[in-house]
Structures are given as C-alpha cells and as structure tokens.
Amino acid sequence: HNVLVRKAEGIETAGSLNILFSDKTGTITKGELEVVDFFTADGTSISANELRHHGKVKGLLDLAIGKNTQAMFDVYHKVIGGNATDQALLKFIGEETFCMLDGNDGCKVSAHQGFNSSNKFSQARIESIGKTFYKGAPERLLAKATKYLDGDGQIKEIDQKALNQKIDSLAAKAMRVLAFGYSEKELVKNQINDDLVIIGLVAIRDDVRPSAKDAIRQVQEAGIQVVMITGDRLETAVAIAKDAGLLKNESDRALSSAQLNQMSDEEVKAILPQIRVIARALPTDKSRMVRLCQEMNLVVGMTGDGVNDSPALKRADVGFAMGSGTEAAKEAGKIVILDDNFSSIKDAIWYGRTIYHNILKFCKFQLVINVTAVVVSAVAPFLGIEEPLKVTHLLFVNLVMDGLGAMMLGNEPALSKYMKEAPRRRD
C-alpha cells in the first residue's frame, strides 16, 4: 500500500486522527505540472511554437527560466532535480535551449538566490549582460514592476488592474500563475529591485488525482477533517479544493497565510472546524496549526516533504513524510508515503483503525479465556472437584489456544466499516 511505517505507534495513532493537514502538489494533485499558457503583461497569449517569432521576449524568458532553476536535463533527456515547478518550466523551454544556455560561457550566473516559501521568488544575476532575472509569485513581482515587455519587445506601462483580472480568471480555473522579470540593478538578497520589467507570465496546470477525490471522501466519512495546505494563491487553491471535494458547504472556510496570521490563537480555534484550505502557507503556519489543534485535544496528522516541514512533522501526532521528500522530513515523520498519494494516507488511517480493532478483539478473547479458567478453578472445589484444571491444562490454554487465537485475530483483514466510525479524541 506504499506506506512505510518508521515508528510502530504511528500507524495505530493514524487510525485515531481527528484532523489531517495535507499538502496539495503531488499528494492531492498528480504532481505532473504542465505549462499550458504563456502571456505578456497585456494579456496577449503566445504559444510555445510562436515564441520563436518574438526574439527579445523569448531570449529573456529563456534566461529567466534556464539560468534561474535547480532542475536540469540528464543524459537520458529527462528532467531531474529542482521541484515540480522548475521541471515543468524547463520542459517548456526545451532541452535544446537549456543545453545551449548551459554551454554558453557568456551567460554564466554570478549570483543566485533560490526560491523559498517566505520570499515567494528566486533570482539570478548574470553580470556579463548586466541583468538580474526573477521568477516567482505574480503579486511579489507586480508589487515592484511598473513596466513590461510586449510581444514585439517594446517596454510599456503595465495596466495592473487588467493583468490581475487575467491572473484571477486563470486561478479560478485551478491554474497556478508564475511571473518572470528582469532588472538592470545588482542582485540584492531577499529583495526585488524597483526597476523590474515583466517579461511575461505562465499558467501551470496540475490536475487533481482521481484516486485522491475518492480517498478524501472516505477520510471525511471517517469523521476526519481534511485541510489542504498549499503555496498557491487563494483563488487557485479554492478552485482545486472544490474539484477535490474539500469545499462543499457555504460554511467551509479558505484562508490565506496572511489572513491566518492576522488572527489570534483564540480566533483561529473558533473557526478551526470550518477551515478547509490554507493558501500561500508558510512552514510556520503548519507548526502553529498543529499546536492549536493539540491545545483543543485533537489528534493531528501533518504531511510534508521539505526540511522546513520537519518541525511540524515532528510535533504532529502523526507526521506523514513524502517518499520524494528530503531525508530530514523522513526522519521527522513517523510514516513515509512512498508514492506521495493521498490514497495511501487513507490506507494508513484504515489499517491504523484495523490494528486497534484487532487488538481489541484479542483483549476480549483473552479476557473470556482467562476469566473462564479462573471461575472454573475457583468454583470447582466447592462442587467436589479438587483440581479441575491441571498445570498442563493451563499451559495448553495459554500457549496453544491463546497463541493461535492471537495470530488469527491479529491478522484479521481490514473491514470497510471501520472507515465509517467516528474517530477517538485525545481526551
């Protein structure tokens, strides 16, 4: 079932979960990101085939992607390294373009800062051409940009309102949008320069796993609250959550990290039962949610794959580390989900409940056998039977009957009815 149990108590505790926080990419969605649209900041879409006719835009976009990434093509022509977004972008520009950039000594990266969940952008400085390239969340780049390149490579003023409407419309279709830009100034760590020019934006699609929809439904029927945590913008997260079956009722809440951090602990606790989505989430949000849930006596499950997720995985009652994640995350988690699939998390919960029921059955069996033996041994002498159960009889009962019974009851199959039961609270 693609579930590796690192700590034995993890699987039994999984059956007692009250709330489960799950990452989106690769767990609820397929993790097979694909660039489906490129458009300039005036909203004009340019297909991958047509880009070669827009020389200046293509040249700068290739640099913004190919020289500002952790991914690469291997000798088997497959994209490796980086995250799923890096890999999707590299496939978009193609292996030929990447290899040409990689072998060009005239565009060596002199300084680089990778993407992190706090900044929401990455940047690379190419000193030989005097430009710093940016890749990241549109709201971060657009906050510093006033100009953009049109399809002909001309620099023009941005209509922020129209562009944001375009981004919102794509987000409502469950698409993730990334922006690219360049600056003539030097790279400044954790900062976007104020002379930023937008090269263009891409829409990336990552469809929900069909198996995840059914698994989410089963977990919800088991009385477990499922909350999706993602780095996507709120509109994109809401669209995906609706598709996955997480947002069904008007009372269900979707919050951004910024909204969450504006609320006090008591305010978050008050609306916690209605929360279904946390967008633009930070690793600190995960740790905070685990702490608040445990203060409410809830048994908490948390998924994660990065080094920054380790504190939350360790603090949660059950940390589900992803098989494709870092070793630090796997060490912090009690269970490793080898295929990164939400369906496997559902299986872990199911078998956790099965183990509990099997232990309960064995305890009942033992109680009946031992109480019967005690009653017979205690009552029989009053009926004239001095030694109804000899030592050999008791040894036979304990070693043979109990042993066989334990093996049979301990290996009873998982029953679907277990996923219909209400979870057990910590208290």
Task: Locate each region found by the language model.
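Conserved cytosolic headpiece of P-type ATPases
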Residues: 1-421
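Short, intrinsically disordered, charge-balanced linker/junction segments flanking boundaries
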Residues: 424-427
